[in-house]
């Protein structure tokens, strides 16, 4: 099984790229979805997060309020590191389980989509790193529109992540997503045809 590690900055278009790859025949494992599973009430990660950040980050049903937690971790790098020390091992374990299931089922191409693939040291579990690249201004505009954030809040979130240029330098494949959706789809189809003829 070929495993593509799909990464990119916030609002770079990773989900759009993953949908195109699914259409081409890949099976996608989304680290964000695994993160939601890993911190569900009753899990050890959930208990550790509440112990680290307090009950003020909980919704009435006991689930983690991602927006409240996000406002803490994007404002404080030590808080972000504390959260990542809790969540990354739990996400890694879930990803390994999913990848093992896919290997057993004979899936030819899997995509592990993770915004922090490189930062979390997860590149060793993939065969190739594909980076979805957009320029910073496009990223800021997309984050503001998608998440309803102010420019300064969007800039703060971008500052908390590895710069796009550094991420792109670590990828075996860089997918430019500054153009139209049609251009993006065409680029991915060309890359796919070369990689998986």
Curated annotation (Swiss-Prot):
InterPro entries: Depp_CoAkinase, P-loop_NTPase. Its main location: cytoplasm. It is an enzyme of class 2 (transferase). Its EC number is 2.7.1.24. Keywords: ATP-binding, Coenzyme A biosynthesis, Cytoplasm, Kinase, Nucleotide-binding, Transferase. The keyword Lipid metabolism does not apply. GO terms for cellular component: cytoplasm. SUPFAM superfamilies: P-loop containing nucleoside triphosphate hydrolases. Belongs to the CoaE family. This is Dephospho-CoA kinase. It comes from Geobacter sulfurreducens (strain ATCC 51573 / DSM 12127 / PCA). The lineage of its organism: Bacteria, Pseudomonadati, Thermodesulfobacteriota, Desulfuromonadia, Geobacterales. The gene is coaE.
